[in-house]
A protein has these predicted regions:
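Radical SAM/AdoMet-radical enzyme domain recognition
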Residues: 48-49, 53-62, 71-175
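Canonical Radical SAM [4Fe-4S] cluster-binding loop centered on the CxxxCxxC motif
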Residues: 2-39
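Active-site neighborhood of divalent metal-dependent phosphoester/pyrophosphate hydrolases
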Residues: 66-67
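Secondary-structure boundary/capping micro-motif
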Residues: 36, 44-47
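Serine/threonine-rich low-complexity intrinsically disordered regions
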Residues: 3, 40-43, 136, 141
């Protein structure tokens, strides 16, 4: 059996930013039932159990949102606990998370290092490009906070990469 990859959306479309191009927030505002809430620990356990029951060799578990860090470190600690509990086939498990990076702190960084997470941070260019699209609900840019958190990830030794959105508008904004 080929390696299994699973995408978990623990926060549904919930997010602490209001990015101009994000379809989650726009879609949620138009649905009869906006957000479906946060994934329960019971559902997480069921997903991990089922995924690992069918995994052979290796398995990648990726988390994204919305903003997955809104689910909190305890949610992700439970995921690691369930991975250890249900890994009866002794598969190699890779964990990854895609985040806007705004909620990261030292505790998150230490968790990522301790549990060997690959962290994708969304950063859309320099301050003008990034802040043009990635704003707080109050309309303020998020670039400075994201860059501070990227520096903290570096210092802590977190394995991370950058995911960027590019558009003609971004190209026309001078850094």
């Amino acid at each position: 059996m080929p390696p299994i990859s699973v995408l978990i959306k623990p926060s549904s479309g919930n997010c602490n930013l209001r990015c101009e191009y994000c379809f989650y927030y726009d879609t949620m505002s138009k649905r009869e039932q906006g957000a479906y809430g946060f994934m329960s620990v019971e559902t997480l356990e069921d997903v991990i159990r089922q995924v690992l029951a069918y995994s052979e060799g290796s398995c990648t578990i990726a988390y994204q949102g919305g903003e997955p860090t809104l689910s909190g470190i305890p949610f992700f600690e439970k995921s690691i606990e369930f991975q250890e509990k249900y890994n009866v086939n002794n598969v190699k498990i890779f964990n990854a998370i895609q985040t806007n990076g705004s909620l990261l702190d030292k505790q998150w960084a230490e968790f990522f290092v301790r549990n060997h997470f690959l962290v994708g941070v969304s950063l859309d260019g320099g301050p003008k490009q990034h802040d043009y699209y990635r704003k707080t609900p109050a309309g303020k840019g998020s670039f400075t906070r994201i860059m501070e958190n990227i520096e903290m990830l570096k210092k802590t030794g977190v394995d991370f990469n950058i995911l960027s959105f590019s558009s003609p508008v971004c190209g026309s904004i001078v850094v």
